[in-house]
């Protein structure tokens, strides 16, 4: 089992490098954060170790840290008129293996349908859905591996497309030093039913991240490098960083910054030589979480640009 996981990870790295310059336009809702904890830390985090099923969406290897029979429900408002929801439930097989079932859904709302003369003839809706199964396994004392197999469908009016893909993840965690490092390949796959004859790929994303909690201090810091299969923009814009203030085992507050989100959302202010660009807070994120026995509530807020933000709520309950 250990050799299989390591071989798969190495194969993914090679494939990601070979496809580094390919466009990523299909099923990009899979890039959205599902975990409010990860959202608060900048939107991408693959390395924090918590008893939290929603982190499985970020890294399938993190399922090994989740308690048996935990139900997780998530809801997020995203941009204008778009809402997304997700759910997860897991089982612990033994001291090494766990599995989970995951689901994601996004509704983009109603849109106008017009003819070639721009005359409105009605309305149509658009939505996307993903269903997945995850398996994680302890490959060694401190090393976990995980795989998620996912089916994805997109519906626009009376048309639809379908795809299949996998996520692969590794996590090394040393509980004595509270240091965690992970590598993840997300969304390797492609369409088997396209809207037209142009079959596309899923939004492949190679990520590496690390988290560290300091001894005798209530802080944990995280840094994640994302989209490492594309190098046509500056290195700093691959970085997502975050910090947590862990007030107790039951409560934390967190903040993060996503450099690429801030860069992409900059808008010009002024004209001529006096013109400047400002992100108006885009890239910033905040959140908090609390746990009461078997119940956990987490909230994450992120700024996308001057007129758009998201609010993500997670609820988990151990049965």
PLM region descriptions:
Residues 15-20:
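Sec/Tat signal peptide C-region and signal peptidase I cleavage site
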Residues 21-319:
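Subset of outer-membrane beta-barrel
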């Amino acid at each position: 089992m250990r050799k299989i996981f390591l071989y798969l990870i190495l194969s993914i790295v090679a494939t990601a490098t070979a496809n580094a310059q390919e466009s990523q336009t299909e099923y990009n809702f899979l890039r959205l954060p599902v975990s409010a904890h990860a959202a608060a830390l900048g939107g991408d985090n693959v390395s924090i170790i918590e008893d939290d099923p929603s982190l499985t969406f970020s890294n399938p290897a993190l399922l090994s840290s989740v308690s048996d029979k935990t139900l997780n429900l998530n809801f997020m408002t995203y941009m204008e008129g778009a809402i997304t929801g997700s759910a997860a439930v897991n089982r612990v097989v033994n001291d090494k293996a766990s599995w989970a079932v995951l689901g994601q859904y996004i509704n983009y709302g109603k849109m106008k349908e017009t003819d070639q003369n721009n005359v409105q003839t009605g309305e149509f809706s658009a939505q996307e859905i993903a269903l997945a199964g995850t398996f994680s396994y302890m490959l060694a004392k401190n090393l976990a591996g995980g795989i998620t197999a996912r089916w994805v469908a997109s519906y626009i009016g009376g048309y639809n497309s379908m795809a299949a893909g996998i996520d692969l993840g590794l996590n090394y965690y040393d509980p004595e030093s509270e240091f965690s490092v992970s590598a993840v390949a997300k969304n390797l796959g492609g369409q088997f039913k396209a809207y037209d004859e142009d079959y596309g790929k899923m939004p492949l994303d190679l990520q590496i991240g690390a988290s560290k909690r300091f001894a005798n201090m209530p802080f944990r810091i995280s840094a994640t490098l994302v989209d490492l299969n594309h190098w046509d923009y500056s290195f700093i814009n691959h970085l997502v960083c975050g910090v947590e203030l862990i007030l107790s085992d039951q409560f934390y507050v967190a903040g993060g910054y996503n450099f690429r989100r801030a860069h992409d959302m900059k808008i010009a202010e002024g004209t001529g030589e006096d013109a400047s660009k400002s992100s108006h807070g885009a890239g910033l994120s905040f959140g908090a979480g609390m746990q009461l026995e078997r119940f956990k509530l987490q909230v994450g807020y992120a700024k996308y640009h001057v007129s758009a933000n998201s609010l993500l709520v997670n609820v988990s309950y151990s049965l």
